[in-house]
Amino acid sequence: MENSLINTIKEDCQYWEKLNGNGFYHYMHLQECEGSKQNGLYQLILNGKELWYGTLAEINAVVKTMIMRIERDFTL
């Protein structure tokens, strides 16, 4: 289950980058921290800086919301 969520987040990060110009100006990725597998905490990195630190479920929600906002703004 954890690997599936990690893959989903990575794919969603790539999709977010595509929506923002293929990562030319903006890039986002999931980063494992020391002990991530043991404590369940990861980092979401946006343009080289930590955007969010938390569980995979929290990070997934953040990424999904960011995608939803961009898609909504493009349709306005």
What is each PLM-predicted segment?
Residues 22-23, 51, 72:
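Short non-domain terminal segments
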Residues 1-41:
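Short N-terminal "domain-start" leader segments
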Residues 5, 9-13, 43-45, 54-73:
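A short, charged, amphipathic alpha-helix used as a generic interaction element across diverse proteins
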Residues 47-49:
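Short strand-turn-strand beta-turns centered on an Asx-Gly dipeptide
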